[in-house]
Amino acid sequence: MRALRAASIAVLAPLLCAQTVNLNDLLASMRKRIETADFRATGHLVWVQPSGVRLSYPITVKARWFPGVLREFVEMGAAARTPGNAPPGARLATHALLEMRPNGQSSISIAHPGDKSPTVLPVEKWSEGPLGPGFGYEDLLEQQYFWTGQASEGKARFGARDCIIVKSTPGPTDRSHYAQVKTWLDPSIGFPVYVEKTVKESGVVKEFTYYGIRHEEGVWSAHQVEVKVRGQSGSTLLILDRGSARANLTLADFSPAQLTKF
């Protein structure tokens, strides 16, 4: 019996170590993807109403990592027509400047046509977005990979992909309106295929599904991300049609002064 126990430990120990290393390697891969970002992409943010009617808004996203901070500049135009039940932000063009710092001190500023100066959003409004709470501003940051709380919840299959589920929880200094984020990561490419984000206090769960995952210019990306609020009808789609994974952006591309220029 003692020999059997020793043999079991000898077999299990490497497996447990491999799981730990695998999680660390996955997180390192995700962080590296963000810390080497330098892209520009254009496409549409699409609001799919419960009735199935779609409203499309042009969007441009550019992002680059600078020492200690990821900067993103988002430009969203107004739709050709806007129904009466549309969120207030959907009626106006929107500019947003997002800054993500690994120490948790991220920030989000937005502006609309006619604004003399941008508005710095408090954390409690990070769940909001141009089209309502489905796809919020914070969802563009992917800061969960830098949070202090990281744990593996084992393996799972999502569609045709074998994934490892990573549970990320913010620490006391991490600014976020999420209580936790669970990510289904494909370890063979180091890229998410599905994500569940739980909102603080309300417990609302938002589901993000990645479609059209591709490898271009040495970078993995998704052609489309669909966001659904669990238990609610309708969805929001972020569709990226074209762009460059090596855009050679500079600090001038992220000047706060650009927020009020429409």
State the predicted function of each range.
Residues 42-77:
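N-terminal, post-signal-peptide region of Sec/Tat-exported proteins
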Residues 1-8:
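Bacterial N-terminal signal peptides that target proteins for export
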Residues 10-19:
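Hydrophobic h-region of N-terminal signal peptides that target proteins for export
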Residues 31-39, 67, 215-219:
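Edge/loop elements at the starts and ends of beta-strands within beta-rich repeat scaffolds
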Residues 30, 59-64, 209-215:
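Extended lipid/amphipathic-ligand handling interfaces
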